[in-house]
Amino acid sequence: MVEVSDTALEPIGDVHRTRIGREATEPMRADIRLLGAILGDTVREQNGDEVFELVERARVEAFRVRHSEIDRAEMARMFEGIDIHHAIPIIRAFSHFALLANVAEDIHRERRRSIHVAAGEPPRDSSLTATYMKLYAAQLDSATIAEALKGALVSPVITAHPTETRRRTIFETQHRITQLMRLHAEGHTETDDGRGIEVELRRQVLRLWQTALIRLFRLQISDEIEVGLRYYPAALFEVISQVNAEVRDALRARWPDADLLSEPILRPGSWIGGDRDGNPNVTAEVVRLATGSAAFTALAHYLAELTALAQELSMSARLITVTPELATLADACPAGARPDEPYRRALQVVRGRLSATAAEILDQQPQHTLELGLPPYATAAELRADLDTIDASLHNHGAGLLADDRLARLREAVRVFGFHLSGLDMRQNSDVHEQVVGELLAWAGVHPDYTSLAEAERVELLAAELSTRRPLIRDGAQLSDLARSELGVLAAAAHAVWTFGPAAVPNYIISMCWSVSDMLEAAVLLKEVGLLDASESEPYCPVGISPLFETIEDLHNGAAILQAMLDLPLYRALVTARGGCQEVMLGYSDSNKDGGYLAANWAVYRAELALVETARKTGIRLRLFHGRGGTVGRGGGPSYQAILAQPPGAVSGSLRLTEQGEVIAAKYAEPQMARRNLESLLAATLESTLLAVEGLGDTAAPAYAVLDEVAALAQRAYAELVHETPGFVEYFKASTPVSEFGALNIGSRPTSRKPTASIADLRAIPWVLAWSQSRVMLPGWYGTGSAFEQWLAAGPESEADRLQVLHDLYQRWPFFRSVLSNMAQVMAKSDLELAARYSELVADETLRRRVFDKIADEHHRTIAMYKRITGQDDLLADNPALARSVFNRFPYLEPLNHLQVELLRRYRSGEDDESVQRGILLTMNGLASALRNSG
């Protein structure tokens, strides 16, 4: 990859081809040229001229395709019959370039923000500064804001993903390249230790090139746990602590008498090691590993910070006077240790006690432990109290500047992360609960055939069981492997709660929750392991029970199920014992796979409206947990706009949402990126809670009626293709790499919940990822164009009048605008010409034409309808940053797609050479990295 020409990097769309636009993006294009040249030099040096020329030819041809100088068929012929040993370095080169282009784009976004701030421009939406200005302008009183933010929580929940599996070495090398490019952007030519930046960049790119991108063996859950935890030392320890403190201080300064945010608002969560829905690899041992590794990460951070603090707080008792509380703390230090340095002695005590805690609760000991024979901390609150003592003493003798630095960050970290780091949610499918509870009831002689009971009988029986403290089983019970496994997993969760604190396992989520009995079955299982006791007037339940409504039908029925649960005095008492808050999870992925993009998004919106009304009537606080994937087809998209697009009352100070896939690295790998994205979540949550953002007012009812009609039409169009077209499953499996996901050891869990060929049983991640790899992006748009077209033609009004209705909704309603904007982003990343190449993998020509023609027609129809409704000529007219990214990045995807098709063809024809398999895996990872939100 030699120096890339400017014309090859010119932003898409005439609106961006202005002199100002080119000047604004020139630094980014220069960074891409620099990194591309270094990568090209590395390829030539390491693999020789022949491989370099192949890579360079592929790059040039890709841009010729972009500029319509050659057609796709000519480029495809370039790779026909290519030697696999030449194909692999080409794939690696373009995969690495995608990674390096990500770095350049991220640096450029930071650069542009700095320029805007330096120019004195108003703070941009999604920043906390802009949000504070809006809140101040609204002139909210203290009582209003205090009530609205009671129990406030914003929780990004990290989940595993098959394509976000970069090895630690790759992760750390990319981090180092980002640091170097940041220095380069600031005008430096050398690092702090005198190394030349370009030389060091070459060193890091060489390390990348000589390091395997993917693991040799199937990803284990232990690998996924490590991937999820790496973001804490990289960024989250620092940024979450800072942002929590800043938000609390800013709001309290404006409303000093409101006592706001007594607990940290920003608290992370995790599913990695607790999500066993369809994943038999999540065992009791895995739960212990996940919770223990998280605790290890937290305590290791605290011990390292305490060690650093001891170096900084060197004050002498001859020069300052400490508080009596600090003196008492320091006196617990063994005699002879730094007698005139009270803070160092106090910190030794804290470090010694925390080391004793680590020895008591961890299987492996972190660095910086100190054996002093002191008692361990029973809770993180005890540790925090000692740190508060140090803080108060420092402020007392005028050392506030020192107290407000590292010590302040550590105190905030302990408030947020405790001994548990992040809450591990447990999740299992309701079918498994039914089977296990039925077995336990039969073994205990309560009922021989629980599954034969009607719903009302089940509820009565389960409520009776929950009203007694008696367990169903005792030691020595003869149970099936499934029942033993489920109870073992829950026992491990109970151990985590009792060892690391109740925040270690905050929620038990029920997948495919269809009824009240589904929730009560989970409660019975929690009771069996000691995590629930409803037999007394004050129930005990440290773990919340959260239903997950994830199909279109379940979303429609969710509010009725919640109402029925809250009508049960026993369950209502459990909710009251947990502060009167009930969490409900909404699934975007399975609802999308079930009914298509528009129908799923509208079903979620309608479900939220109904759940909010149920919460209002019953007097509980509702917390919604959004099961969003990285892609629009799984509920993804810009978080700020997505949160503002929620219906009135749906946020109410609390929000949880899943973060997964390449999105995690894009958001949280670097402190600057992490801060920006966490600020965005907080800003939107505060605005949605405290300001009127829906924009519909009295016109909500007719707007909802329009979407009811359009969503029904969209679901019908989607069903005709996905559920009713003969041979569709065969087409999907042949025209995408979905079949290879399982065969090539991608991810730690099966691609389907059950061993069937059904789309319904296929997991949402492989469903979306497969369409993404083949560049169809079908889950993010299919059915929408037909629905709008039919709706325009269906009413008594003229088509022009009905089009104006849709245009007005787009202008005024954040939800509708967000849905269309996210769809446009997906369609801008789709490429039907490349998709046609994948369709050639379908052997049955009649089937191929039948399905692909439907997809192509709907694609054209959807783009046309988007442009008519919005009045825009370009899919990305309102998102110039993404337009630049698509134009700059996507020519480099071209060779990866063509090579993936070529290697899939070989693999399926019986050429199962290890190199062919590895090549397919590399193309998958390269495309996922380049698309940044592929699954």
From Swiss-Prot:
Its EC number is 4.1.1.31. HAMAP family: PEPcase_type1. This is Phosphoenolpyruvate carboxylase. One of its GO terms (biological process) is oxaloacetate metabolic process. The active site is at H161, K593. GO terms for cellular component: cytosol. It catalyses: oxaloacetate + phosphate = phosphoenolpyruvate + hydrogencarbonate. It holds the Pfam family PEPcase. Belongs to the PEPCase type 1 family. Its cofactor is Mg(2+). Forms oxaloacetate, a four-carbon dicarboxylic acid source for the tricarboxylic acid cycle. It comes from the Bacteria. It comes from Mycobacterium ulcerans (strain Agy99). GO terms for molecular function: magnesium ion binding; phosphoenolpyruvate carboxylase activity. Keywords: Carbon dioxide fixation, Lyase, Magnesium.
